[in-house]
């Protein structure tokens, strides 16, 4: 009850009969009484007595202090259940206080009191549910705004800490919130209640949300009288969708969302645009593609600039919801490891790790899914001669329908792959003569149709091979019987093209009423062009289908058989194929299959460069709008920061499209990289390493390296983005390309502002990581001078990181064979720092030795030979700071090593003699640190204080 000492007594000024004029008549000495001379009446009261006294006070301040000290009172009486219940009952009476400030103060203490009751549940069972929760719920409808806000915050805090029982949520909380959102409820209270319902939905779970919250939420979305209510519903729409799941979202929420997106109030439409990504994540691919895309196009073309601004900011995140591991070539599972890093499974069922050079293929970036091997493939279906390039993925024309395509989850695909391989091993000899009629050498036409680019250009049908593999040769149908089966539609067929054209026509029709807006007019032009392109694509696909049909007829006529394959259409998700090479020797995996052409080289041919920016992963209209975000006119009509938003979401869009569609984004990325605003370039610089992982080494070397080089020469605000992820980017490059940057690392020491020491500190951090990427000679020739320069930096934080860098460098060079560079580095440390004329250099030498000992960068016998003699000579240094640090290092670090504790060598004797000399030093601090036991203090704290005190 410490706070009660501040309480004001409601007593007359002369009640105690004492005043400053009192004095002793005998001695005529004036006595001024002190408050410590009297026993306060409060000290004579019990905690409950003090609580009752001040809770009934007419002074508002006293009642506020009572509310603030309730938790302390509970702690004092927690040993007695009866007293705890008495305090809780007085809380209920205090909740009826007429002063809003008292009620608000009480509500601020409720979460703390509830937590105390939960921790002491055996003493006061059901205390919260019976005494506190009714107060919280009642205050949700309080007339005072401050009390309502405080109770709402308290309710959310209680739900977040799971202090409210599930039954109480259903029977006490939700009914009150539903009543507060009734049509006849107060407008302000209704709006706040809807917001509370939306925020508590993720905390109470799917079941309660669907049964109790969702019906009323749908009603509030259609509240015609209060646009504030609709705006709150729109702003929290994504949270509700993520809680209730896909089915409830599509059946109940989507119709309301469409209404909100066309609301008369622009604030409601803007809120819809801001939560569009969350809504999209809760729907299936088909609805996302057919309905939400058209709805989003309407928001992008909205008459209100604020709505368009919010829509463009959400465009990149919305496009990212179309991402599929099979189309992107990347799939990240647990432990943050890419599925591409998993072990490869050979035909014989033996798991082997992918062989790759460390400098060419870093551990966290390997070949994409497009370069994986086909699950359960047949040798006659995808034969390849040893002379073929690893970059070729050749599939004969007459067997193009024999490839197993997968649009399932990566986990399912992995399990199917194992079972498929086992089945393939058992049936390979039986199936080989019946399936394959293709020759080992593909024809030039095959190479043109099924090179890596055309292979990814259009999705292929999904085919089930199990039926054909499980049938005996005698049971397989004849070509005539196979031809009688009805043909299933494939992607790119006229029926699918008709659906696309119909979708485009509907979009154009919806936008025509807003043709006065230049943005809407531009959008109509884009959609019209897409409509014309879809018409042309329909003719091209029809011609290609006829050509494939002729090739298959020729194969059948030559004596081949087409197996009985059930073809199923799956246009809702991008497809991926994994091709397995059947070479008897060690398999050469297709590296970056989406990046390499028929000749195995990287990059794209001139014909591919000129191809239109068309893809099939996301609706083309969305991609066109995203690409238009770099248009200068957008900055004037939408948002001056629109280019920055485009740059921020570009890695997500690139991951969604996959590296096979990088040609759609290349020009946009180059435009952003040369943007006049440094914030745009800075955003790209911070994410270029992520984009390099997505694109693979071939495209990175061709398209990202030039931009990366430009960022290295940019402003410091841009360069810091490159520097923070320098190791992450360089490890993705080929060793030869990586070595080119050794000459540019020195430039990071030069900054626009010499006081920007954090830049140099980050450089030291990155150099520690870069040690593993370069050879010992490169480390010695290029990284060593930078490290020694940083060790002499003016700022202690930079020097501390640099000591770690030098010690790691000593470790790497000493482990090299032969350790010549390591010895030379140690000699340079001794010469430049151990014998430095400046005492700060000699102190740095001690710090480096200390770090080498702590991190075991050198074997102790080698340390005793190369560094310790020079270290011990500093015992006679004329500067006390150096001797203090030496005493700490010897006593607290060196003597803790087993080598110096167990061996009775001359090195141990030299250390003991040095410590004895330091214990007799004329400086008291040196004596202290040379005498104390190693475990009695922390070296890092003392050393840091020594370092900081010297500058």
Swiss-Prot record:
Basic and acidic residues compositional bias, start-end: 332-360, 464-483, 539-551
Induction record: Up-regulated in anti-Thy1 glomerulonephritis.
Molecular function GO terms recorded: protein phosphatase regulator activity
Gene Ontology, cellular component aspect: cytoplasm
Keywords: Phosphoprotein, Repeat
Protein's UniProt keywords contain Phosphoprotein: yes
Phosphoserine: modified positions: 936
HEAT repeats: 26-63, 82-119, 127-164, 168-206, 208-246, 248-285, 287-324, 502-539, 699-735, 777-815, 820-858, 862-899
Keyword Glycosyltransferase among UniProt keywords: no
Biased composition (Gly residues): 594-604
Region Disordered, residue ranges: 326-395, 407-501, 539-569, 592-612
Role according to the record: Regulatory subunit of serine/threonine-protein phosphatase 4. May play a role in regulation of cell division in renal glomeruli. The PPP4C-PPP4R1 PP4 complex may play a role in dephosphorylation and regulation of HDAC3. Plays a role in the inhibition of TNF-induced NF-kappa-B activation by regulating the dephosphorylation of TRAF2.
Quaternary structure, from the entry: Serine/threonine-protein phosphatase 4 (PP4) occurs in different assemblies of the catalytic and one or more regulatory subunits. Component of the PP4 complex PPP4C-PPP4R1. Interacts with HDAC3.
Listed name of the protein: Serine/threonine-protein phosphatase 4 regulatory subunit 1
Native source species: Rattus norvegicus (Rat)
